[in-house]
Structures are given as structure tokens and as C-alpha cells.
From Swiss-Prot:
It is found in: Membrane. Its main location: membrane. GO terms for molecular function: cadmium ion transmembrane transporter activity; manganese ion transmembrane transporter activity. It comes from Oryza sativa subsp. japonica (Rice). This is Metal transporter Nramp3. Pfam families: Nramp (PF01566). Probable metal transporter. Keywords: Ion transport, Iron, Iron transport, Membrane, Transmembrane, Transmembrane helix, Transport. Coiled coil: none annotated. One of its GO terms (cellular component) is plasma membrane.
Length: 550
């Protein structure tokens, strides 16, 4: 529908034509885009509408089966068998709830998480949150760099450090995507990742893990042995990534959702269903990888070569786990799937970086320049580590990158929980008490396990580093001061009151009445115009509308 909106009992749509006719204010699109293939949600109630919402959840779920997840899953299974499966279960459930909140924030307010942060926090706080978000994007890109380098090593015997340099060429691939569209490559990626997932599931049948041990690992929390806590944190960081919250809240802005209470609730429900389906697939893939790794490496019939691989398992050695299914082709096919996984994650990481920069700083870069910047920052540590320590050290860098993501998660999660629990931002679409308790419990658990690991690891480092007493004292002072700053920053975000009202726009109104107030309050900074042209103008994979299925 185009033209001026009129009051009606029917749900109202806000078209891009109307948006372009507005004055250049906060709601003006960053890109004067023109012909954008919009995804329009029909007004009629139908389960076919679900097909119109499919897309964002699957793009986000790519991060749950990236090389970082492969690496942490393989090491978790090889070192602790099925002991850490419960982390995957909890992380997957937490991810579903948290990602659904991110989608809801975008649908209800018409603004994504980074934009809300810019509107809500002082300049200094906003700048720090932007730096942390950018570091999260870079930390997420490190596994993609190393995973791609490992894949090139398996395919062409290229040294890992050379492969790290070659990964910069993925920028050229992104350029091609911008020119020819994403659909065909995403379809190819889906086939390759599905193929490797199928192989692990079939291998699961060959390896025959002890079902009672698997069930125990899923439902009985345990953290035994040295390094279990650190690996659990890396698993958590690999599953619930801070950049995904920014990404998901922005991707949903590409849909033309009915601006009515019912239309918004339906959109939130369908986005949750789509996310649940996508994350269930990712959950099964992660569970199968850990179980295969645990069953194979825990076997008593391993050859000396396989025993050596299991003792220092990383992505570069993991193909032997698939020999029962693929034989001599295991290495090549695993490398191709690893390459596909790394490149697909690079694409979503690039978009996440764009949304972060646009939201926090009101700046926008050409995608290939944005990709080149992020990739350059990720290549530097990967190159140094791969040259000095080889593939084993590069694999450990993936674990460290995942741990960094876990430590940074509260700085994206707390603002999300605060915003979605705020009636002045979400109106009647705020989180229920049950959801609030669950999500704040998840956030508290993450902070507690991160703090516990920091303290125990730092104390061990102080006691066994061989430094003089004076050096230990000063190291302890600075180390614990850093931990106090970390905790204080989180507490600041938790207890700071929201000060900006960003309300949903309903039924064509420019103002929304807050429950319990006598006057209409203008939704400050609320865009309310979906689809957002600065979002939908990006050449993301487009889905058929529900009307196309009739």
C-alpha cells in the first residue's frame, strides 16, 4: 500500500514511498534506495504467513555451526566425552529465548539494538559499547579465518599461515555476492553444511555412543577436570554470540509487518517459531559432533595415529572422525564443508558489523570495505599465532576467541533485556514476568561463570608464574582491579534506568499512549516504518511471500 495512511480498523502498513516523502529527520533512511524487493506480510491470518518470515533466523543460526563451534565441540568431546553436552542444551535454549527477544525489539520498535543503545546511553558509554561490539565481531571472525585456512590446508596442502593470508580474498567473494545476489551461494552453503551434518549423524550411528552417558551428559551438569570450566565458557561463547543480537534485531526490519497489535504479536510468534526450527537443527549438529568426537576418541580400539589426533584434536585433524562414512574422501569433504561454513559466517558477520557501526555511530560502509576492515583485524592475531605455534596454537586461538565472546556477551545482553522489559520502549509488548526471570537468570549465570573462571585462572597464574613477590603483588592488584571494573560496568548497565521512550507505532498514529498515563507520549526516535530501507536494501536472501504460495 502506498500513499498517505488513513485511520482504519484494519492493520496499517507503512510503505517505503511514505518514508521517502518524510523530511530528512532521524527516521530518514541511510540509503536512498530505490527498487528493493520487499517482503510483504499478508493481512489475512494464515500459517502460510510463516513462509514470509523465514530467513533471519536461519541467517543467525549460521553462527551456531561456524568453525568456532566445530572446534569447541571437537575438543569438548575429545577431552570430556559427553560431560559438557548440558552446556549445549542450556546454551541452545538460552539462545532461542534471547534471539526471540532481539527479533521482538526490532519488530515492535522499528529500531535495532545498536540504534537503541545510541539513543539511550551517554556518548562515553555508547562509545565503549561500540568498541566492545566491534571486538565481538572481530573475535567472531577469527574462527572463520582459521577455519578457512585449515580447509585450504586440507584441500591444497597450503601452510596454515599462508591460508590465513588468503582468507583476505573472501572480500572479493563478498563483492561478487553484492553484484549477483546471495541466494545461489546461500543455497550451496546450505547443501554443504547439511551434507556434513548428515555425515556426522550417520557417523553417530557407526560410533554408537553410550546412550545413557549421552542422556546423563545432556541433563546432569558436571565440570570435572582441569580446563572444563574454560571449555564450557568457550562453548557458551560459541553458542550465544553478542553480535548475533545486533544482527537479528536488524534483519527483522526487512519485513513489511502489519502495524497493529495483532500483526506485531503474530510477527513475534512466527519469528520465534522460525528461530526454534533453525536453532534445533544447529543444536542437533553440535550434539552429534560432540558425541562422535567423544565416542571415537573414548574408544579402546584406536590406532596410535588416531590416539595422537585425539590428544590434540583441532579442525585440521578432525576429518578422521568421518572415515567410517566417507573413507578416503573424509578429509576433502570436511574441508569443503568447513570452507563453506567459514564463508557463510563471514557474510553474516559483515552485515552484523555494518549494523553495529550504523547503529552506534550513524555511519555506514560499503560491505566489502567493512569486510576488509574486520578481516584485517582478525588476520593479524591469527597470522602471528599460526606462524609461531602452527595449527595447534591456531586451534587454541579459536577457543580463546570464543571465550572473549562469552565475556563480552553481558554488554549486549543486558541492554537487550533492559529495553525489552521497558514499557516506555515496548508498550504492551514488554517481556512477561516469567520471561524476565528466565532471561535475567541466564544473564546472571553467564556473569557468574565468567567471573568464577577469571578469578580461579588468575589466582592459578599468580601462584605458578615464577615472578617475584613484588611483581605478583602488583599483578594481583591490576588483575583484580580489572575484574572489579568488569563487574562495575555490568552493574551500571543493569541498574541504570532507561530514560528514552521509543514506542511502537500502531494503526498509523504518530504517537502512542502509555498505559497509566493521561497524555500521549511521542515515541522519541521510534521509526515504526517497516520495512527499513537501509536494512532491506542489502542484498540478503529473499524468500517468497505467503501470497506466492496460494
Amino acid at each position: 500500500m502506498s500513499g498517505p495512511m488513513q485511520r482504519s480498523s484494519q492493520p496499517q502498513f507503512i510503505s517505503s514511498v511514505e518514508r521517502n516523502n518524510q523530511s530528512n529527520g532521524p527516521g530518514t533512511p541511510l540509503i536512498d534506495s530505490i527498487d528493493v524487493d520487499q517482503i510483504v506480510i499478508p493481512e489475512k491470518n494464515s500459517w502460510k504467513n510463516l513462509f514470509s518470515y523465514i530467513g533471519p533466523g536461519f541467517l543467525v543460526s549460521i553462527a551456531y555451526i561456524d568453525p568456532g563451534n566445530f572446534e569447541t565441540d571437537l575438543q569438548a568431546g575429545a577431552q570430556y566425552k559427553y560431560e559438557l553436552l548440558w552446556i549445549i542444551l542450556i546454551a541452545s535454549c538460552a539462545a532461542l529465548i534471547i534471539q526471540s527477544l532481539a527479533a521482538r525489539l526490532g519488530v515492535v520498535t522499528g529500531k535495532h539494538l545498536a540504534e537503541h543503545c545510541r539513543a539511550e546511553y551517554p556518548k562515553a558509554t555508547n562509545f565503549i559499547l561500540w568498541i566492545l561490539a566491534e571486538l565481538a565481531v572481530v573475535a567472531c571472525d577469527i574462527p572463520e579465518v582459521i577455519g578457512t585456512a585449515f580447509a585450504l590446508n586440507m584441500l591444497f596442502k597450503i601452510p596454515v599461515w599462508c591460508g590465513v593470508l588468503i582468507t583476505g580474498l573472501s572480500t572479493l567473494m563478498l563483492l561478487l555476492l553484492q553484484q549477483y545476489g546471495v541466494r545461489k551461494l546461500e543455497f550451496l552453503i546450505a547443501i554443504l553444511v547439511s551434507l556434513i551434518a548428515t555425515c556426522f549423524l550417520v557417523e553417530l550411528g557407526y560410533s554408537k555412543p553410550n546412550s545413557s552417558e549421552v542422556v546423563r551428559g545432556l541433563f546432569v551438569p558436571e565440570l570435572k577436570g582441569n580446563g572444563a570450566t574454560g571449555l564450557a565458557i568457550s562453548l557458551l561463547g560459541a553458542m550465544v554470540m553478542p553480535h548475533n543480537l545486533f544482527l537479528h534485531s536488524a534483519l527483522v526490519l526487512s519485513r513489511k509487518v502489519p502495524r497493529s497489535v495483532h500483526g506485531i504479536k503474530e510477527a513475534c510468534r512466527f519469528y520465534m517459531i522460525e528461530s526454534a526450527f533453525a536453532l534445533t537443527i544447529a543444536f542437533l549438529i553440535n550434539i552429534s559432533i560432540i558425541s562422535v568426537s567423544g565416542a571415537v576418541c573414548g574408544s579402546d580400539n584406536l590406532s596410535p595415529e588416531d590416539q595422537m589426533n585425539c590428544s590434540d584434536l583441532d579442525l585440521n585433524k578432525a576429518s578422521f572422525l568421518l572415515k567410517n562414512v566417507l573413507g578416503n574422501w573424509s578429509s576433502k569433504l570436511f574441508a569443503v564443508a568447513l570452507l563453506a561454513s567459514g564463508q557463510s559466517s563471514t557474510i553474516t558477520g559483515t552485515y552484523a558489523g555494518q549494523y553495529v557501526m550504523q547503529g552506534f555511530l550513524d555511519l555506514r560502509m560499503t560491505p566489502w570495505i567493512r569486510n576488509l576492515l574486520t578481516r584485517s583485524l582478525a588476520i593479524l592475531p591469527s597470522l602471528i599465532v599460526s606462524i609461531i605455534g602452527g595449527s595447534s596454537a591456531a586451534g587454541q586461538l579459536i577457543i580463546i576467541a570464543s571465550m572473549i565472546l562469552s565475556f563480552e556477551l553481558p554488554f549486549a545482553l543486558v541492554p537487550l533485556l533492559k529495553f525489552t522489559s521497558s514499557r516506555t520502549k515496548m508498550g504492551q509488548h514488554t517481556n512477561s514476568k516469567a520471561i524476565s526471570v528466565i532471561t535475567w537468570g541466564i544473564g546472571s549465570f553467564i556473569v557468574v561463570i565468567n567471573t568464577y573462571f577469571l578469578i580461579t585462572s588468575f589466582v592459578k597464574l599468580l601462584l605458578h608464574n615464577g615472578l617475584s613477590t613484588v611483581s605478583q603483588v602488583f599483578s594481583g592488584i591490576f588483575g583484580f582491579l580489572g575484574m572489579l571494573i568488569y563487574m562495575a560496568a555490568i552493574l551500571y548497565l543493569v541498574f541504570r534506568k532507561n530514560r528514552k521512550a521509543t514506542l511502537p507505532l500502531l494503526e498509523g498514529d504518530s504517537t502512542v499512549r502509555i498505559v497509566g498515563r493521561d497524555t500521549a507520549t511521542e515515541g522519541e526516535g521510534s521509526l515504526g516504518h517497516l520495512p527499513r530501507e537501509d536494512i532491506s536494501s542489502m542484498q540478503l536472501p529473499q524468500q517468497r511471500t505467503a501470497s506466492d504460495l496460494d
